[in-house]
Amino acid sequence: MNEKVSNPFPANHIGMHFCPSEVQSSILNSGLFRVIEDDVDPKDVDADYVFDCRGKPKDFSEYKKLKNPINAAILAKPNWNTLECLWSRHIATPDGWTFIIPTHPDSPSHDYCVGYCYNSDITPPNEAEENFLSQFDVDVKKHVKYKNYVAKNPIDDRIILNGNRLYFLEPLESSSVQTYLEWA
């Protein structure tokens, strides 16, 4: 055991939150990778392996629908300092649940670090927003609806689906990471 590293949390039991645009910028500008910004088919990339992280698919014909009680979220900017609590919080609500992610106010993700998750087939969006605002001091930024899905074929020869290209269950799941840990 490395005496300088103390981590009692197994990787499949913890999660990490990060701002996607900041991570992407950091990786692309690191100089560690040859970056070609273009709209390409992963099959045309000259590499031994390609990790397809292009986000949510436009066509869901190659995906299985996953059952989940929520299918929508209202994203908001908090009117308080979320950094006073250094871990994410999950609060049960009348319509589903709310997540609060401690996010630095300068981060592009700060405007969306509080999310009210609910089922739009049961609760109308205006009612969900009313309930959200009655429980939390936030400025609503946007409403999103989403599908819960997993790829039927996550690995196709040398192309490996990852992130939202592989799987989406709900806003706070790091689903693809956990899925690969379980498959391994």
Where are these regions (language model features)?
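Residue-level detector of alpha-helix boundaries and kinks
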Residues: 12, 85, 169-172
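Generic secondary-structure boundary/loop-capping signal
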Residues: 15, 71, 165-166
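Amphipathic heptad-repeat coiled-coil/leucine-zipper-like oligomerization helices
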Residues: 7-8
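Active-site rim elements
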Residues: 11-17
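N-terminal FAD cofactor-binding segment of flavoenzymes
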Residues: 1-4
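FAD/FMN-dependent oxidoreductases across multiple families
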Residues: 104-106, 117-184
